[in-house]
């Protein structure tokens, strides 16, 4: 490819709309352009990167025995109604009607469609197991699209679905996909960790997320420094912290003007934060759920939803709170209205251990002190509903844990029979009895993997692509297009690299050398061959983008040298 023919409109200034490195650099490098909120066009360089990621995925899917299909983006509403997810999925689902008033959605995922696709075709246990996968656009109407490709309304996803005769078979399929995903992300050259995860709206109770570790990640991950345990913080179950014994006092009401937050209490009343008991209230499908945690802890809303059930989780309104005797800013179980089917109180196990603590009185400007929840909170439900912190220990081995950020680039789910039962998708077993398929599903965010790679691998000059996913593996850069000797050597090297199957770009633009160097660093080609004044002496410069290593190499044999260098870098996943 010649740079003079390449459509790659680079930008000199940082785009104001970009909040994270991947978004900024893909716009600057001429890989991506925004069309509307959460909607992007991939330009040739960006599309090449996506295709390289897709080809790595395709190779490993074929190796695993999965078979590629393609299903429609537009899906009929009735199959989503069969599983009950038409209303459950919420406003993130794009819904539409055709001219005949039939309802459809733009697929956010394809569990329903794939299950209906096989339910009348796979009839016998002899046809199983089967794993079908596709590379397809997905659509989710994000309330706040942001961070470029990391949270967009349209994205490319690889999704696979396995069908087995029993749970043992499903676990085997799950492990096959888990191993394939590990190979995929290793070859893509990103630092990742598989972590235990919640299944969310997909369902099932067996799941791992593949997290690309990056500061820009929206997910919090806990990792044990001793045994290697790793989990999404929503899935990690912290231990109950036991408070030290002390003499108990009777709870007493006291005035706390302008103390509507935990921080206000700490600063004005001078109470230690671990002695405060914080209230967070949710509206879950119209049910009021009051949760209580220690003041320095955060509520795990996923754990709360898993305990209570329901689909639509919102912050409770002041009107709903007051209808149940709760005063916003001063809430607690004390003086609250009676619990019933529409009102439940959940207290975290660690909060229940507090002695002589401070919590709200459900009266504006007042709190109770010397509160001991185990004694004073009546008829409440207790459970572990807080997020793990670095002050906790590993739930597996008791070792030290660290929190870090991650970008979810893939997830594997053991679905069980959730979809096959609701969609009446069955096969005949060895005894001729109808049984529901035991399913798994497995997703990789292709475009998100591209963004995650940049989040991990960039510097102040631009992107640092691994060889496996770079838009071009190497660039030949003649510094002066008016010097015939330089141009002749550059074209010769370019042709030799093409003959060696190197994916190479010749920067034949009539631009200053500095402009070409800046663009090469911005776009992030792994290897740069600079053809300059020493070309007449039979020498060119070879530079590795990742390490900034430079070396002068004789022109004779330089193409073979670069090809070997690229092979070595790729073997090391660099």
Annotate each PLM feature:
Residues 1-98, 110, 161-200, 297:
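TRNA-binding/sensing appendages of the translation machinery
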Residues 75-79, 320-321, 508-515:
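Short acidic loop-to-helix transition motifs that present clustered carboxylates
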Residues 87-104, 212-223:
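Acidic, His- and aromatic-enriched active-site or binding-groove loops in soluble protein domains
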Residues 99-133:
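Hydrophobic alpha-helical hairpins/lids featuring a short glycine-rich hinge
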Residues 111-119, 144-158, 168-442, 446:
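Extended, low-hydrophobicity, polar/charged segments
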Residues 265, 440-468, 473:
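C-terminal, non-catalytic macromolecule-binding modules
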Residues 462-516:
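Generic long, charged, amphipathic alpha-helical segments
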Residues 493-561:
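C-terminal structured "cap/appendage" subdomains that terminate the fold
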């Amino acid at each position: 490819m010649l740079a003079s023919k390449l459509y790659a409109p680079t930008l000199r200034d940082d785009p104001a709309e970009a909040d994270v490195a991947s978004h900024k650099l893909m716009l600057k490098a001429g890989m991506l352009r925004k069309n509307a909120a959460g909607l992007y066009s991939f330009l040739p360089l960006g599309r090449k990167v996506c295709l390289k990621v897709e080809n790595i995925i395709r190779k490993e899917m074929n190796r695993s025995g999965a078979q590629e299909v393609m299903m429609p983006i537009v899906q009929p509403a009735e199959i989503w109604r069969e599983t009950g997810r038409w209303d459950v999925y919420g406003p993130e689902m794009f819904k539409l009607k055709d001219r005949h008033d039939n309802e459809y959605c733009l697929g956010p995922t394809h569990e329903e469609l794939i299950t209906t696709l096989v339910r009348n075709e796979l009839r016998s246990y002899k046809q199983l197991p089967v794993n079908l996968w596709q590379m397809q656009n997905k659509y989710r109407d994000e309330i706040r699209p942001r961070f470029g490709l990391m949270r967009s309304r349209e994205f490319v996803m690889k999704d696979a679905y396995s069908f087995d005769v029993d749970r043992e078979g499903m676990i085997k399929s799950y492990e096959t996909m888990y191993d394939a995903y590990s190979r995929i992300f290793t070859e893509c050259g990103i630092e990742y960790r598989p972590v235990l995860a919640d299944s969310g709206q997909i369902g099932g109770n067996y799941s791992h997320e593949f997290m690309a570790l990056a500061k820009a990640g929206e997910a919090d991950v806990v990792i044990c420094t001793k045994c290697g345990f790793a989990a999404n913080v929503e899935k990690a179950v912290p231990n109950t912290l036991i408070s030290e014994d002390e003499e108990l006092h009777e709870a007493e009401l006291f005035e706390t003007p302008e103390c509507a937050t935990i921080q206000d209490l700490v600063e004005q009343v001078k109470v230690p934060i671990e002695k405060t008991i914080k209230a967070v209230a949710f509206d879950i499908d119209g049910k009021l759920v009051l949760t209580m945690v220690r003041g320095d802890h955060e509520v795990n809303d996923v754990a709360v939803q898993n305990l209570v059930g329901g689909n639509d989780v919102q912050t409770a309104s002041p009107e709903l709170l007051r209808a149940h005797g709760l005063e916003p800013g001063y809430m607690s179980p004390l003086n609250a209205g009676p619990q019933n089917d529409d009102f439940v109180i959940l207290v975290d196990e660690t909060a229940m251990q507090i002695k002589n603590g401070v919590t709200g009185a459900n009266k504006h400007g007042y709190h109770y002190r010397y509160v001991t929840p185990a004694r004073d909170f009546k008829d409440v439900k207790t459970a572990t509903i807080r997020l793990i912190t670095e002050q906790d220990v590993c739930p597996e081995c008791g070792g030290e844990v660290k929190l870090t950020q991650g970008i979810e680039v893939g997830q594997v789910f053991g679905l069980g029979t959730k979809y096959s039962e609701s969609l009446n998708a069955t096969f005949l077993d060895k005894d001729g009895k109808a049984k529901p398929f035991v399913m798994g599903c497995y997703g990789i965010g292709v475009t998100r993997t591209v963004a995650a790679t940049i989040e991990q691998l960039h510097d102040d000059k631009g992107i640092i692509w691994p060889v496996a996913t770079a838009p071009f593996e190497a660039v030949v850069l003649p510094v002066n297009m008016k010097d015939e000797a330089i141009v002749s050597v550059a074209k010769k090297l370019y042709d030799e690299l093409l003959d060696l199957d190197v994916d190479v770009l010749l920067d034949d633009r009539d631009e200053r050398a500095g402009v070409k160097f800046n663009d090469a660093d911005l776009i992030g080609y792994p290897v740069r061959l600079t053809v300059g004044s020493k070309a007449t002496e039979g020498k060119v410069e070879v530079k590795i983008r990742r390490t900034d290593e430079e070396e002068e190499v004789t022109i004779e044999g330089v193409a073979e040298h670069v090809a070997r260098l690229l092979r070595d870098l790729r073997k090391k996943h660099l």
